[in-house]
């Protein structure tokens, strides 16, 4: 069972943003920019090319809704979407608040305090 499957099942803690029948979203542990959120299907799938159509569509529909909430929560002009899949072998869509192209670089990723994470979690959820 993957790290993300354990998060979905509640076996590992997370800062949950949104959940429905097919998807789960939570703050990335290492934040590229504050508000960086992952949207994943509940079905464990290694690569985005292999995910079912329903799950793929739901990930993207929810990412649009969550992306709008992130924009309001952090007052950014864009939310970038990135699918990389190198660190965790599970299809996941990164939603990263951005003010410019360099703002999307994973070299910027860092751990935030529990207080910062709880505050941005609450703020994003308030705009859903």
PLM feature spans:
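HIT superfamily nucleotide-processing domains
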Residues: 1-128
């Amino acid at each position: 069972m993957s790290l993300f499957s354990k998060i979905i099942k509640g076996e590992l803690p997370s800062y949950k943003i949104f959940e429905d029948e097919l998807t789960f979203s939570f703050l990335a542990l290492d934040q590229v920019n504050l508000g960086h959120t992952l949207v994943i299907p509940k079905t464990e799938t290694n690569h985005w090319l292999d995910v079912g159509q329903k799950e793929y569509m739901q990930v993207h529909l929810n990412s649009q809704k969550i992306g709008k909430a992130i924009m309001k929560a952090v007052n950014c002009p864009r939310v970038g979407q990135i699918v990389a899949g190198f660190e965790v072998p599970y299809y996941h869509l990164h939603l990263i608040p951005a003010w410019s192209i360099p703002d999307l670089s994973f070299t910027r990723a860092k751990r935030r305090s529990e207080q910062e994470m709880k505050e941005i979690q609450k703020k994003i959820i308030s705009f859903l």
